[in-house]
Amino acid sequence: MRRAHYHESAVSAAAEAIYQIVRRIPYGCVASYGQVARLAGLPGRARLVGRALAETPAETGTLPWHRVINAQGRISLTGASAREQQKRLRSEGVVIRKGRIDLRAHGWKAGSDSPLLD
């Protein structure tokens, strides 16, 4: 089976679409990888969101990567990265109980007032 190869500009375009959505997630809210993928026009590409966030170039500026979690309301990262994500979320008032974030309380309702961050 042949692996699909993506043209570099297509990957860059997808990553930029992902970054644009992540920039819109409001302070104190979270979104799932799948939600970000759908809103970026990449339905079913949750793993691509994770990969794009892991490979975020420095020139993208401040990107609130910590606001993206899995669909079960859990942090998917491990080790120091997971601790940093928890720290950042808690500093925004996001409550984490038994390793889970209540998506009803903190989930981003896309379409609400969430302007793009510069």
Predicted segment positions?
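Nucleic acid-binding interface residues in structured DNA/RNA-binding domains
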Residues: R2-D118
